[in-house]
Amino acid sequence: MRPPLTSRLAGFGTSVFAEVTALAREHGAVNLGQGYPDFDGPQFVKDAAAAAMRDGHNQYAPMPGLPALQRAVADHQRRFYGIELDPASEVTIHPGATGALCATFAALLDPGDEAIVLEPFYDAYRPGIALAQARAVVVPLAPPAFRLEAATLEAAVTPRTRLLVLNSPGNPSGRVLDASELEA
């Protein structure tokens, strides 16, 4: 019988988030694993969501996202970070990080390419890269500072390197890379 998963996903087990969720349920604990607050959402947010559905905003959105939301994201980036973006061509809205990452890896990586990831990292990086038939190259960031050393990063780069996954603040460390690390 053929295994249920493709060979590209062999060796990837349950995510740490699924394990934490199961343990929290089993022991009646608060789940700090992945956005499970122990309080209800604000009523005004729930009311706005219900009103939007009543007003007919309950169909599939355009592939890149609703234009008003794309504009709001571009405005936010300009206002807070001084980054000018064209909402129609440079902002894509996605319903979740994991799906967005997989789509990005599939769009940017060819079979045999390498993607550098800084460790510790979000556990969806490796399987997403594997689905693109590429290879994750891990660059460890040593605790407690989790600093990115330019020499360590440079040593990981090969002719097959196509992508550097740079997430700041880091997930799960929360570490924000400083200007000297980003410039190196």
Locations of regions flagged by a protein language model:
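N-terminal small-domain helix-loop-helix segment of the aminotransferase-like
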Residues: 8-96, 103
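CheY-like receiver
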Residues: 23, 104, 152-156
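Short glycine-rich anion-binding loops that position phosphate/pyrophosphate groups of nucleotides
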Residues: 36-37, 98, 168-172
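Short acidic capping loops at alpha-helix termini that bridge into adjacent secondary structure
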Residues: 84-91, 111-114, 160
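Conserved PLP-anchoring active-site segment centered on the Schiff-base-forming lysine
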Residues: 107-129
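A short helix-loop-beta submotif of the ANL/AMP-binding
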Residues: 131-137
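Active-site phosphate-binding strand-loop segment of PLP-dependent enzymes
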Residues: 137, 141-184
